Structure formats: structure tokens, C-alpha cells
Amino acid sequence: MLALVGSGEFLETMRAVDATLLERASGAGRSHVVVIPTASIPDGPSVVARWSALGEHHFAGLGASVDVVRIGAGESADDPQVAERIGAASLIYFSGGKPGFLLRALRGTAAWSAAL
């Protein structure tokens, strides 16, 4: 499933939307979300840390297990273990930032293949 969601990620107003996404992505099983804050790297480490923490808190609050994958901020997009972590997700969530940067960081990588 692919869901393109504009701004507002991790806000209280998005709980119902994200709960529906989790339900549809994982069915009756427990949801496992991978949050990828790569698009925020140009805004600095504190912004990456903020998106990481917000995403983890938000989806854990919805009952999902959460793995934050910091591609470009300590983790490689071509690392097979990173790709495996992404492939294990029932929902992959790319948080806010610069979409063009995200595209350049992931295009043609093992991480992107795992997301598809």
C-alpha cells in the first residue's frame, strides 16, 4: 500500500488517519512501522532527532512497534541490514523535510528496493 500524506505528520489530528493506515497495512497482526527521517537531514541533526522522536512516540502510541532508520544520518542506504529492517515493515513512513534530498539519497539503493 502506498499513502501520500501531506504535512501534519505525527500530530494528534492525524491519529485517525494513521490508525487506519496501520490497520490496512497490517490486518489483524501487530503493526511494525519504519520511520525514515532522511528528508530532514538538510535541516540539521536536531531536526532529524526531532522527527525521529515524534514518529516513534506517535506510532508507539497507536500500538505499533517502531524502528527509526536514519539513512544518511549514520546508516547507509545500501547496507543489507538496513534494507532488511525496511523490508520487515508493515508501514514505511517518510517524515517531513526536503523531498528532492530524499529522492537523491534513496534512488537506486537497497533501501529503496526494500521499500518498494
Please annotate each region the language model reported.
Residues 99-109:
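Glycine/threonine-rich flexible loop motifs
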Residues 1-101:
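Extended, subdomain-level signal for the structured scaffold at the beginning of enzyme domains
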Residues 85-88, 108-116:
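Catalytic-core regions built around general acid/base machinery
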